[in-house]
Amino acid sequence: MFINLLNEDEIKSCLDGIGKDTFKDGNKSQPLEDVKNNKESVGVPEEVRKLIINKIYDAHYIDCVYCPTRVSVNYYNQYKKGNYYNLHVDNFKAYPKSNNVHFDYGFSINLSDEYEGGEIYFSTEVGTIGRKLKAGEAAIFPIIYPHGVQEVTKGLRTNVLGWFSSNVSYEQSFMLKNLYEVNQHLSQDSTNGAFVKSVLVQNYLKKEWGK
């Protein structure tokens, strides 16, 4: 799922949090050879972490579809020309701040779009899905999905990444996503009985799954 999450001022705040000595060799967190070639930060400033956590919790779409319960903002990534990240599944143990908490979904938020290549892609049940994210746009995906970043051919790609826990399963979130989209379509005519019914069903499912 892709969603516009940060505005220009918020993007600037995130970029301002990148220090002079922030980045290290990204291979430190991925022990397998030839998996990635990028730079990865040693952490995220507290003010940036709080900003992103609040944005995740406040996003209506994310709340309706994923019902996040705990959000962890972990690190920045940077990709210059020639950098890439091959297909992989996230390695939680490489990040001590995760405290062995179980996470259900990952997110990657782009902080720049003045680059070429660098598309994020996922291996799903229906095939490979890829997209070049706009600045401020987030990709949200089940943590079990193998994912990667195509080689950057020009410019600098910067993003911030994290995970969150959820009260609903992947199958349930797919159903909630469909209900949300129906709601959005029918909300242009709030007198439509189907709209009211869809909202009630969605709220009921969230309540039942949260027990």
Locate each region found by the language model.
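Non-heme Fe(II)/2-oxoglutarate
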Residues: 1-70, 75, 175-211
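Catalytic core of non-heme Fe(II) oxygenases with the double-stranded beta-helix
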Residues: 61-177
